[in-house]
Curated annotation (Swiss-Prot):
A Gene Ontology biological process term: tetrahydrofolate interconversion
Organism name: Syntrophobacter fumaroxidans (strain DSM 10017 / MPOB)
InterPro entries on file: Formate_THF_ligase, P-loop_NTPase
Protein name, per record: Formate--tetrahydrofolate ligase
Gene3D superfamilies the record matches: Domain 2, N(10)-formyltetrahydrofolate synthetase, Formyltetrahydrofolate synthetase, domain 3, P-loop containing nucleotide triphosphate hydrolases
EC number, as in UniProt: 6.3.4.3
Length: 587
């Protein structure tokens, strides 16, 4: 029986479901794993991916299903909930199913968006551990990342304070001539802290560091998090952590973590992060959690490692991409799958009637405020105008050769005529379409959805990339802008174009993937523009270089790597029951 999600908070549903949650050793038996492949951590466990992959290397892969969404409202449209609901629906159909979601950042958890654990009866458990650090991967990434900044700033201080002779005699340290105006990396923390976007460090005497402008980003924007999502194994992690560009010297040459001799220590912090954490849904379907990069400012994917394990362990493996199809799906398609070599079968387009009404010209949706009545009452005119956004994303998925399935993530305010209108346009655009009530009913409410996905998986995928790596950077950006965003073209600031030309002329960057940095709230660079706008140009103001991840990141519009905390954050409603020690108020 599903829980009454209209009367119970998510954390209350999680508490009830946790009473019968399998232990790590029960999971070992249920999943047919060997004892040495389970790494217990309290009531959770990690999976030793090398041991599992070595044992299952000859087993055929299962069906590979990606979950994305239409351009969302600021509230999000329920991709995590839909991913969990699909696992539960497939489980109700008796198939061997599992999946992988990203680890949530503490910033959104304590801010507006919540935990990304799903919701209602389509929920990952245990919710407290999921929301409050899980098995420590983000903390390990923060330590490794900030250690690189410690190495850099200490080196700058010592090079200023000591002569060449003293440096050689004391430490055998060669002078790197670091340019304090060209420090790329910055510091990170796992909260939305707008006060730390621009800071001055090193204030004090000569022993108090090197005084310069610096910055903080949110932990999930770190290149190290992106690296975790794409690495193949521990040697690959070690190699990439030694190649990160931290700064540039006064001649314009990169200063790397290898130059600072810190890559090995960074790997020591992250050695355990390469193993995914095993959790489950409220209906006890297995789901891994691994990596957590945002999609608008990073790659937005759970890990290749977890997908490789899942495709060996399960007949159907579900993975989620961040934000909408123009952001997360595009990176799944052209970045993640290029690195992994895996061939996906189906892409689920999570769709809500409220978001389509917004794209049709509905009133502004503001987190924390009541929804205007246009969203809670039938309005076929707004809906029909906004459906173009869904159709645009269906067409994007079809360009990849994958089979699209539109999931109408049901709300109790949706009417039969509204649902029928969405279904008609989705099917006319070449997608299968299913209504799903997984939030209210769990797997039982997702049977139509599960059946549509099973049917789509029977159709052979014609997967292909949008562009070849041989294509020049500016041409790749133009291709993504035109084919995925619907832009007429691309404009470059003089500095950004000069940087792009430099990168195009250096063969070292020929095999770097292109990872766009853009708002998730619009197909354009302007978050206020909704629907499917025409006659616009994508402005590129910079190109970031992630030399460890091997990403070139063109930045469209103004994007901050450190979000801000709102005036009504979630942490105001989170507390601990001091009699039981249990956390309450998470959502």
């Amino acid at each position: 029986m599903p829980y009454d999600a209209t009367k119970m908070m998510d954390w209350q549903i999680s508490e009830e479901a946790e009473k019968d949650m399998p232990s790590p050793w029960q999971w070992q038996e249920k999943l047919g794993l060997l004892k040495e492949e389970i790494l217990p951590m309290g009531r959770l466990c990690k999976l030793d991916f090398l041991k599992i992959m070595n044992r299952l290397k000859d087993k055929p892969d299962g069906k590979y299903i990606e979950v994305t969404a239409i351009t969302p409202t600021p509230l999000g449209e329920g991709k995590s909930t839909t991913s969990v609901g699909l696992m539960e629906g497939l489980g109700k159909r008796g198939v061997n199913v599992g999946g992988c979601l990203r680890q949530p950042s503490g910033g959104p958890t304590m801010n507006i968006k919540g935990t990304a654990a799903g919701g209602g009866n389509a929920l990952l458990i245990p919710m407290t551990e999921f929301s409050m650090g899980l098995t420590g991967d983000i903390n390990d990434i923060m330590n490794a990342h900030n250690l690189a900044m410690v190495a850099l700033t200490a080196r700058m201080q010592h090079e200023r304070n000591y002569t060449d002779e003293q440096l050689d005699r004391l430490t055998k340290m060669r002078r790197l001539h670091i340019d304090p105006t060209r420090v790329e990396m910055g510091w990170i923390m796992d909260f939305c802290a707008q006060a730390l976007r621009n800071i001055i460090i090193g204030i004090g005497g000569r022993q108090d560091g090197y005084m310069m402008q610096s910055k903080f980003g949110i932990a999930v924007s770190s290149e190290l998090m992106a690296i975790l999502s794409i690495v193949k194994d521990l040697p690959d992690l070690r190699k990439r952590l030694n190649e990160i560009t931290v700064a540039f010297d006064r001649r314009g040459n990169p200063v790397t973590t290898g130059d600072l001799e810190v890559g090995g220590a960074m790997t020591a912090f992250m050695r355990n992060t390469i193993n995914p954490t095993l959790m489950c849904t409220a209906e006890y379907q297995p789901c891994m959690v691994h990596a957590g990069p945002f999609a608008n400012i990073a790659v937005g994917q759970s890990s290749i490692i977890a997908d490789r394990i899942g495709l060996k362990m399960f007949d159907y493996h579900v993975t989620e991409s961040g934000f909408a199809a123009d952001i997360g799906f595009e990176k799944f398609w052209n970045v993640k799958c290029r690195y992994s070599g895996l061939k996906p079968h189906v892409s689920v387009l999570t769709t809500t009637i409220r978001a389509l009404k917004m794209h049709g010209g509905g009133p502004k949706v503001v987190a924390g405020l009541a929804m205007p009545e246009e969203y809670t009452k039938e309005n076929l005119k707004l809906l029909e105008k906004g459906i173009v956004n869904m159709v645009h994303h269906i067409n994007t998925i079809r360009k990849s050769g994958m089979n699209p399935v539109v999931c109408i993530n049901a709300f109790h305010t949706d009417t039969k005529d509204e649902i029928a209108l969405v279904r008609k346009h989705a099917e006319a655009a070449g997608a299968r379409c299913a209504l799903s009530e997984h939030w209210a009913k769990g797997g039982e409410g997702a049977l139509e959805f599960a059946d549509a996905v099973i049917d789509a998986c029977k159709q052979e995928s014609q997967f292909k990339f949008l562009y070849p790596l041989e294509m020049k950077l500016r041409d790749r950006v133009s291709t993504v802008a035109r084919e995925v965003y619907g832009a007429d073209g691309v404009s470059w600031t003089p500095d950004a174009e000069a940087k792009a030309k430099m990168l195009e002329n250096d063969p070292k960057y020929d095999d770097y993937a292109t990872m766009m940095v853009k708002t998730h709230l619009s197909l354009t660079h302007d978050p206020s523009v909704k629907g499917v706008p025409k006659g616009w140009v994508l402005p590129i103001r910079d190109v970031l270089i992630y030399s460890g991840a091997k990403f070139l990141c063109p930045c469209a519009g103004t994007i901050s790597l450190m979000p801000g905390t709102s005036s009504n954050p979630a942490f105001r409603r989170i507390d601990v029951d001091v009699n039981t020690g249990k956390v309450k108020g998470l959502f």
